[in-house]
Each structure stands twice: as C-alpha cells, then as structure tokens.
Amino acid sequence: MKLRSKAAALLLLALAVLLLALLSLRARRDPEPPGFPARPEAAPQRRHAPVPTLPPEPRAFPGAAGRRSPRRQPPRLRPRAGRPRAASREKLARRPGETRSLHSVPPELWIHLAVVACGNRLEETLVMLKSAVLFSHRKMRFHIFTEDALKPEFDKQLRQWPDSYTKKFEHRLYPITFSVGNPQEWKKLFKPCAAQRLFLPAILKDVDSLLYVDTDVLFLRPVDDIWKLLRQFNSTQLAAMAPEHEIPKIGWYSRFARHPFYGSAGVNSGVMLMNLTRIRNTQFKNSLIPAGLAWEEMLLPLYQKYKSAITWGDQDLLNIIFYYNPECLYVFPCQWNYRPDHCMYGSNCKEAEREGVSVLHGNRGVYHDDKQPTFRALYEAIRDFPFQDNLFQSMYYPLQLKFLETVHTLCGRIPQVFLKQIEKTMRRAYEKHVIIHMGPNPMS
C-alpha cells in the first residue's frame, strides 16, 4: 500500500510539473497583460475614426458622388489644399455644402438673374427667387427692378430666409427707369414695367451676362444648367430664347402678327439669356436706316414705327430685332420655357416629354386660377415649402397627391413631364448632402 501511495504521489507531481510547463509556454506566446482591451474592440474605433477635414480639390475627385473611397488609400494620393487650377474654380463654386465658403467664389463666376416686378407681382417674384435658391449650386446675384413702394417688402422678405440659403445669393434693388422716350408710355407697354428688360444692357453696365425671367417663372432644376447654355453661343450669338410655339401653323405669330417676327413661329421672351457685353458692342441691322444701330439708340424709333402693330409689347420688339438679325439669336428647346400652350391643346413639347420640364412659365395667370391646376399645384408647392424641411417629404410627395386631382385636364394627364426634373434635382441634392456632410466610409 505504501508503494502504491508513493507511486500515485509521484504521478500527480509529474502531472503538476507538466501543467506548469504548458502554462509557462503559453504565457511566452501571448505576453498581453491582463486588462488590455481586446483587439477586435479596438479595430472598429480605428476604422470609423473621423476623417480629417481637408479643403476640397475638385480636380482630384471628378464625379465623386456615389463613388466609394479605395481601401487604405496611400497618403500621396490625398489632394493638396489650396492648389486648384483656374479651370476648376467653377466646380468649386457649384458644389453646395462644401467647407469652402460661397463668399470666396470669384464674382465673375456668379450667376446674374434679373426680374422686373410691379403692381401685385411681389409674391410671384419671391416664389420664383425661392425656386432658384432651393435647387441651385453657384452663388447668384439677383437684380430686382421694382417700384419704390415694393422695395422695403422685397428687402424684408429676402432677409428673413434662413442663413443656409441667404449665403447663396446677394440682391440689389433698382428703380424702374427708361433712358429714352416717354417713361409712362414704356411702363404701360403690355404688362406693367415689362419693357424694362429692353434697357438692361444700358443699366447693368458692369454685368457681362444675364438671365432675365418673368415673375411667373419657376425653376425645377438648378439655374446653373440653363446658365451653361451661354457656352453654346457661337461668335455672333448674343441672346437666347425659346420658340413661341412648337407648331407654327397653329402659333399666334404665324396667324395674327402684323409685324416681322423671328423664324416661323416667333420667340417667347419670358426666359431670356443675354450676353450684355456683346449686345452693347453690336451694330444691329434694322428697317429704319441702311446703317447699323446700337441697341439703345434703336429701341425708341423701332417702337415708334411699330407701336400700332404690336400686341405683346416688348416681346414683339425683340421679335422684330431678331427678324433682321437672326444670326444673333440662339434658340433653346421648349423645356426651358414650358407654358400652358405646350400641353393644354395636347402635348407638343417633345424635349419636355423626354427630359422633363426644366423651367416652368405660368403665363395666362394660371398660378392664380383653376384653368390649369397642374401649374397651380407646382406654384403652391414651392410657395408653401418650409425652407428647412425635407424636399421629398414636404414638397415632392404632397405634389404627387395634388397631381392626382388634375388628371381630368390635358396637362394633368402627363404628370411625369412636370415631375421628372424636379425629382432628379431633389435626389441629386440629397445625395450631395449625404456625401459631402456625412462623408463616405473611408475603410469600406
């Protein structure tokens, strides 16, 4: 018995020594002291650490929206701050939400937007400007020509908009002035004060290019996009407008005009791009004298010759000017000046059917009556939209519901024409907000 007890004790001792040896070997392989955080817990902290904010460099990230960052990008590929080429400055000006301030955008890259508002056009004008600010990227300067009685209210309303929007534009208020002829006669020509647009090249002498719109215009995509059409001008073109009608044989000018007009159907001046520098420097052919005349010196004699024959005021005068100078006009598609005439007799704007409406022109007073409820629904949706709300939830979805109530009208039967561009614009704005402000996952 004693021998067996000794053998058992020796066996237990040997097992204890072997166990100690194994524990010692394991300790050498894993020297982490107790209490050190486990590696799997530390790794996500490194993976999701905030990316240092760098000044944007557009030429290093063309088309960055929707693109994933590469895994473990080498430091040498990071964009260097403060070295953008001159060609990339325009891209910097166009991107909303960038860390770079809009105030640093060079003035020559600003969009200049002009409007003339008299009488009861205050609300319409503010809604138009709101649509421009909601969707556009580049900084804008608003040139608002209005009566003295309306100036304080314009200034008050625009300054009440949120800072996130007011930083995107500056506004200037101008009196209604006509440099030649009888001011009262010009003021009463067609709509109140509309003839003011004819004198913009002489008044805005420090502005190179300009987009003029009527008060009843709404932008359904960034103003930047129509501004780009200036680049498509050839060496002789100095203004751009859309046709008055897409089907000449049923158009107004081709059937009723008693004066010369551009092309086969005339042009509509409710949305008008102008290269003011070229207009100021051009001698225009005319029906008054054999020699060319400068823009400003041509206006009064032209009006005096044709005033008994014109119906649509300043628009008729513009048609007469470009009848004699067709090489000076660039004609853009009807989607950039979409009016009730394009759908109330059946859809006849093919570009809008393909691309969607880009600029809506609610002439005939359709924003304020029940004749074209589709146009009125869009106007009210933008007018009533709270600036800081979600565009989809507070504008787009309610707009879809309103359109269901307009299907009994010819314009209401094609809701996709009205919604296509505004949906694309909202989606793009949402994606840019997420990518720029939230940032892509750098390790995904």
UniProtKB/Swiss-Prot annotation:
The chain crosses the membrane at residues 5-25. Residues 1-4 are cytoplasmic. GO terms for cellular component: membrane. One of its GO terms (biological process) is O-glycan processing. Coiled coil: none annotated. GO terms for molecular function: UDP-D-xylose:beta-D-glucoside alpha-1,3-D-xylosyltransferase activity; UDP-xylosyltransferase activity. It comes from the Eukaryota. The keyword Magnesium does not apply. Residues 31-101 are annotated as: Disordered. Residues 87-101 have a biased composition (Basic and acidic residues). It is a single-pass type II membrane protein. It is an enzyme of class 2 (transferase). Glycans are attached at N275. It is found in: Membrane. Residues 26-444 are lumenal. It catalyses: 3-O-(beta-D-glucosyl)-L-seryl-[EGF-like domain protein] + UDP-alpha-D-xylose = 3-O-[alpha-D-xylosyl-(1->3)-beta-D-glucosyl]-L-seryl-[EGF-like domain protein] + UDP + H(+). Residues 68-83 have a biased composition (Basic residues). SUPFAM superfamilies: Nucleotide-diphospho-sugar transferases (SSF53448). The keyword Transmembrane applies. Keywords: Glycoprotein, Glycosyltransferase, Membrane, Signal-anchor, Transferase, Transmembrane, Transmembrane helix. Belongs to the glycosyltransferase 8 family. Glycosyltransferase which elongates the O-linked glucose attached to EGF-like repeats in the extracellular domain of Notch proteins by catalyzing the addition of xylose. This is Glucoside xylosyltransferase 2. The lineage of its organism: Eukaryota, Metazoa, Chordata, Craniata, Vertebrata.
